[in-house]
Amino acid sequence: MPGFTCCVPGCYSNSHRDKGLHFYTFPKDPELRCLWLKNVSRGGVSGCFSTFQPTNGHRVCSLHFQGGRKSYSIKVPTIFPLRGVNEKRTRRSSTKKRQQPNYTPAATTVLVTGLPGQEEQEVLELTAGGAEMMLLSTTAGMGATITNVEGSSAVIGATIDAMGTAAVERGSVAAPSNLAVKLDVGEAHAISTHFSSDASHGSHQQLQVVVVGDEPFPSVDCWPSLLGSDHSYSMSSGTTTEELLRKLNEQRDIIALMEVKMKEMKSSIKHLKVTEVKLREELRQKDKDKVSPMIKSN
């Protein structure tokens, strides 16, 4: 971003963006300059500001002066409400131990096919945890029963009854269905799930769900740990809008300072080129002056 950026740590005012602000250079008077440096490089700020030597490109915006403007009576910036960019901050993540993902084998491929009389069939990707969630989130008014569930390393028996009244509140009756679920893990194990309700409410629909294959997948409680990152500008679950804006402003401030430095370097290069041309011309003139007397003497 072009223009001047306030050099006060934690302030991101820019002359190009903030048209209503004034930007002041550091005074030449030694005493005033010392006071400015002492206030700008205030306690708790480390890094370049500990040995900060301002140049003409460093400006202080009017937000840091009483009354919002520098005057004859107000010559020293004293308002610093923002936190320093380089202040030492304790990282919240350093005190927290990251959870290691617990991977559990789970069947993922689910084939849903219609029984005779139904043409549609569909292939879904589902985990064992997802299948359980699907069973628990069935249409309100249905009863779900899971029996005789066996695995390669454990024997599980459970009964889940999910009852609700949402369908009654909507004034509609859920269509009853029978759902058969089969699990193929290399052994002859099966999960039999039956959803049913009163047969007098309507016709029955039947679906067959076949789950095949094994694939390790992290449990749901480990997902937040997978989203964490050690990068200082990464977005964690606890990142607030103010923190994100502060980080973006820091990046914007760095870019603005780099642009100012690039302009200064370009100006210096241009000045050096002009000086080089002048020196070459002077050398050429001196050589010419030396040769002229020799020619006249001959």
Curated annotation (Swiss-Prot):
A zinc finger (THAP-type) spans 6-64. GO terms for biological process: regulation of transcription by RNA polymerase II. Keywords: Coiled coil, DNA-binding, Metal-binding, Nucleus, Repressor, Transcription, Transcription regulation, Zinc, Zinc-finger. Residues 242-283 form a coiled coil. The keyword tRNA-binding does not apply. It is found in: Nucleus. Disulfide bonds: none annotated. SMART domains: DM3 (SM00692), THAP (SM00980). The keyword tRNA-binding does not apply. It comes from the Eukaryota. Its main location: nucleus. InterPro entries: THAP_Znf. One of its GO terms (cellular component) is nucleoplasm. GO terms for molecular function: DNA binding; RNA polymerase II cis-regulatory region sequence-specific DNA binding; zinc ion binding. Transcriptional repressor that plays a central role for embryogenesis and the pluripotency of embryonic stem (ES) cells. Sequence-specific DNA-binding factor that represses gene expression in pluripotent ES cells by directly binding to key genetic loci and recruiting epigenetic modifiers. Belongs to the THAP11 family. This is THAP domain-containing protein 11. The lineage of its organism: Eukaryota, Metazoa, Chordata, Craniata, Vertebrata.
